[in-house]
């Protein structure tokens, strides 16, 4: 047993303070308890408010990008005030500081999006939304995908945690929005929204995946986390994130990437990159055998992309 994970010296699990982040931290704690036979008192959940949770009236790209979700947790982990940090991997920068180590990923939940509409609108699919409807999102990927499918729709900024976005929707700030199915499920909102197929809305890289980081020099905690790592999820998500690294995109880049294990045991990676207005897009897929295959896909997508897309990626 890790000497940290005792009632007298509990393993401190850092997390954002939002309801979804707290639910995910409790999932990580439950996995550690089950894997190591720990007492509940051997773990301590340490919530903190991320900068991204405080700023909700502007797009991420205007105020610092994905680092807004990790800055406080990174500082606490580096300072030793927490031992591990639990993240929604979709919100974590592609290139991480070498001081931190991604020690585990929990088994991935449903990676798809759900379409949620306000009262008075009957739509199960994006194609069924009324002409000119306002679809709220802060995601460049979702905005570009929606604009490609329905150029008539008005995409408007809608930020905040799940409850905040649902409240804004109910208040009429938008007619519809797209939310991650995994987040809704983890919050117990099983009946909210209609799932959208990946053939229409390919997910964001890492969507539905929970990652747990520790300090790279903390061998004991690395060993503790290894027992709860879901290897198939880790390999699939690593492929998606490797593609992002090749593309050089940031939080302003409309990119979708999803690696899925096939019935014959191979891992297929699908990816799409878009112009901001969704009018231009390039798609491709590979069977993942090694890092070189993923890199080749990224380079091919960029080579085939028109200037309207390439300018959104740091090549």
Swiss-Prot record:
Monomer. One of its GO terms (molecular function) is hydroxymethylbilane synthase activity. It comes from Sphingopyxis alaskensis (strain DSM 13593 / LMG 18877 / RB2256). One of its GO terms (cellular component) is cytoplasm. Binds 1 dipyrromethane group covalently. This is Porphobilinogen deaminase. Its EC number is 2.5.1.61. The keyword Ion transport does not apply. It catalyses: 4 porphobilinogen + H2O = hydroxymethylbilane + 4 NH4(+). Keywords: Porphyrin biosynthesis, Transferase. It holds the Pfam family Porphobil_deamC. NCBIfam families: hemC. Its cofactor is dipyrromethane. The modification S-(dipyrrolylmethanemethyl)cysteine is found at residue 251. Pathway: Porphyrin-containing compound metabolism; protoporphyrin-IX biosynthesis; coproporphyrinogen-III from 5-aminolevulinate: step 2/4.
